[in-house]
Regions:
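Metal-coordinating catalytic core of metallo-dependent amide/deamination hydrolases
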Residues: 118-212
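Hydrophobic/aromatic beta-strand patches that form the interior of the parallel beta-sheet core
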Residues: 5, 47-49, 61, 97, ...
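Histidine-rich, glycine-flanked metal-binding segment
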Residues: 2-3, 10-57
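Divalent metal-coordination and catalytic microenvironments
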Residues: 8, 26, 53, 64, ...
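Metal-associated gating/positioning segment near the N- to mid-region
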Residues: 51-114
Length: 212
């Protein structure tokens, strides 16, 4: 399938101005000045799209999404629905990192990894963190490093809550251990080993992060 987007305003991410974009299958093969590209009439499977008054950008990366739904802090009826590929891509998100929030009980790591795999199968790039607000971290295997090392979709730990009334109020030693275990998992797997932190409005502020 060949697609030609004509006369579209491109940010790549730098501003390129009005251009034509030629796409073959799922790859951009050429970007040229507006009006300079065309598809020969003898190509049976082709589509031309008028990009006038439209903007084309790379897909956005959203590194904190409750793909299983959020909420629940006001009771069971307060839970929000799962994210969908259509809902994400509608707003230009093509890479997503899923996480659990306050509720690591009604939603768990098995469900989060399964949801992440499903989004990947649908065509979006999807990853996730191991854990939720709580410390000790509830992992899928028996450890943070093992989760990150052995499960393709898991790239770090989170969302760990600090300085928040919904947090487990981790000590400095506990928070340091989470950081060290996440770092180890990243080193062993060749991943970044990210820690995603939820920071509330408590008086401790960023104290734990600064000390670590």
């Amino acid at each position: 399938m060949i697609k030609l987007i004509q006369n579209i305003d491109i940010y790549a991410p730098e501003h390129l101005g009005k251009k034509d974009v030629l796409i073959i299958h799922d790859k951009i093969v050429k970007i040229a000045d507006a009006g300079s590209l065309s598809i020969p009439s003898y190509f049976p499977e082709s589509e031309q799209i008028d990009g006038t008054n439209l903007i084309l950008t790379p897909g956005f990366i959203d590194c904190h999404v409750h793909v299983l739904g959020g909420g629940g802090e006001g009771g069971f009826a307060n839970r929000t629905p799962e994210a969908t590929m259509e809902g994400l891509t509608k707003f230009g998100v093509t890479t997503v990192v899923g996480c659990l929030g306050t509720d690591g009980i009604g939603r768990d790591m098995c469900a989060l990894v399964a949801k992440t795999k499903g989004l990947n199968e649908q065509g979006i790039s999807a990853y996730c963190y191991t854990g939720s607000y709580q410390v000790p971290v509830r992992t899928l295997t028996d450890s943070i490093p093992k989760d990150i090392m052995m499960i393709q979709e898991i790239i770090g730990t989170g969302e760990i809550a600090i300085s928040d009334h919904r947090s487990s109020q981790p000590t400095f030693e506990e928070f340091t251990r989470v950081a060290a275990d996440t770092r180890l998992g990243g080193v062993l797997s060749g991943k970044a080993g990210i820690i995603n932190v939820h920071l509330g409005d408590g008086s401790r502020g960023m104290e734990l992060i600064n000390r670590v």
